[in-house]
């Protein structure tokens, strides 16, 4: 028997990251659209004196960076999917991209809140008609971008939607939706300000938008940090795996480690004790019903 190469015992460590994904291409498209609209809104916000419009433009600037990070995460994970220095592949790169997006959302919320408070204390003249037109165009671009990313969001997620979520794509999607929200708030503030002859609604809407964006940021931070810290898999899921192995009457699971290694891919390390232990392959076969278990290591001990 040759030990130089044993393909039947080798494991793939790509975990679904080795091929280009639709989300990668669509994220690049949305990044280009967002960049173009960012330039228009920042320029118009400064020129027309609208804080809501300027806030939306600044918000878009953070999203251009976040979308760029998301696109880079897809490409990096794919290019290094088979790199042996990544012990369990590059599946968590997407979660890391989502975490970076969450941080970007938080920074955007802080910037918008700060500038809105300044504008609330020192109102400025606003060219309402011009600003409204630009805000409407921005909303159309944001909605188109959200549709592009939302289609992929549904396509990639199967089964348990929360557990199989593409956090990188989720982060990009939330950035676009946050842009759409600030565009809507800008339009409401500008139209109301024009009709009422008031400028205070403009920064107030900026404050409202910053609080909503901060809430989204917190949710994404919580979800992605769970993946990065291997704390995402539910107790219920762990119990189901344990029950599947303990179907043998004299077998007990004494140690179980379960964590995510990629979208729709989990890894498990299981230690079992039995008075009549079987080969590790027997226990792996008991777990075959869990199709998202991509890497399983079984440690078998004889009961004393």
Where do the protein language model's features map onto the residues?
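The first (N-terminal) embedded transmembrane alpha-helix
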Residues: 29-40
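Alpha-helical transmembrane segments and adjacent TM-loop junctions that form the membrane-embedded core
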Residues: 2-16, 20-23, 58, 66-76, ...
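Interfacial helix-loop-helix junctions of multi-pass membrane proteins
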Residues: 43-54, 121-129
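Transmembrane helix interruption/hinge and helix-loop junction motifs
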Residues: 41, 46-50, 195-201
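Active-site alpha-helix of zinc metalloproteases
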Residues: 34, 51-55, 170-171
